[in-house]
């Protein structure tokens, strides 16, 4: 009997079967005003309401018979299965730039916890006040007294889309652009290597977190079984896209082309999926501001050749998308409509960041009323979720999910 693949993503819109999320936790309560910028937040969310909103989001998915797995639970189970807490902890501490005796204090303290508690601490951050007072021997320890953390919190973890992305039956485990997020992909790596659900399968890693250039899941869209669309953005480096293409062409029998689309390097457009997502077979939502008045932007078609890669530059974005989908035309639904003020406001609140749970069926934030009405007018079934606190992190329903399995399109 052939074993069913643990990972299977061959489109953006196939019926969503299994998804990985992270419930917002105490890491959000370790954000303070002076560290907002370094932790990539614009405001301090209200955790209790944020959790209610996230629970509503999860129930919405479960109501469509989607299996929802929690990152924190799987990570603890994987750590227990690995039977080597110290090895994982050593890697985490090393990537947190802890040195000298402080690294030993941190390790000894965290080793006293069971797997669930340890994972919780590693995600929420470790305050200096939590460890008993000790004598400081080194200059850097004495001078760094005002900084409150041994291990920084990971408040962006509820955006599970970015640390990794499934392509086909394999995965990219990503090198994150910002230091504040770099440890996040370690939890995905731990789960895929050691959790019983995944460890007995040979899962190809198309791009690993040891890569020299940054790549993030919000920039990775699986258009078809043969075509990947990747944003070159504030967070994803063009060199990472080229290396990913080379890896896919040499190791994946299905992938024939990678499309690289250039988007402005700004915080509001931090990933491709903040300005462009697929909602149906030939329908997409788009933030109009990423194109010029003629609907053009830079897109590059990467294909395998005898000498390595062929790269073809194009400007006619809509036509390229139609061609790779085998459609005569595609419909671009503008986020916020034609009004530039409404469009900018709703894009800022993730109006273009839809999560497709089936062809023509999406989950969106309730606050983006103009965008949601336009989707419905275009024949899309829209499930709205409450979002006053979730949206403060600058990510929407697609950002908050890492799809592990979708039905293949017929």
UniProtKB/Swiss-Prot annotation:
Pathway: Amino-acid degradation; L-arginine degradation via ADI pathway; carbamoyl phosphate from L-arginine: step 1/2. GO terms for cellular component: cytoplasm. GO terms for biological process: arginine catabolic process to ornithine; arginine deiminase pathway. Its main location: cytoplasm. It catalyses: L-arginine + H2O = L-citrulline + NH4(+). Keywords: Arginine metabolism, Cytoplasm, Hydrolase. It is found in: Cytoplasm. Its EC number is 3.5.3.6. InterPro entries: Arg_deiminase. The active site is at residue 399. One of its GO terms (molecular function) is arginine deiminase activity. Belongs to the arginine deiminase family. This is Arginine deiminase. The lineage of its organism: Bacteria, Bacillati, Bacillota, Bacilli, Bacillales.
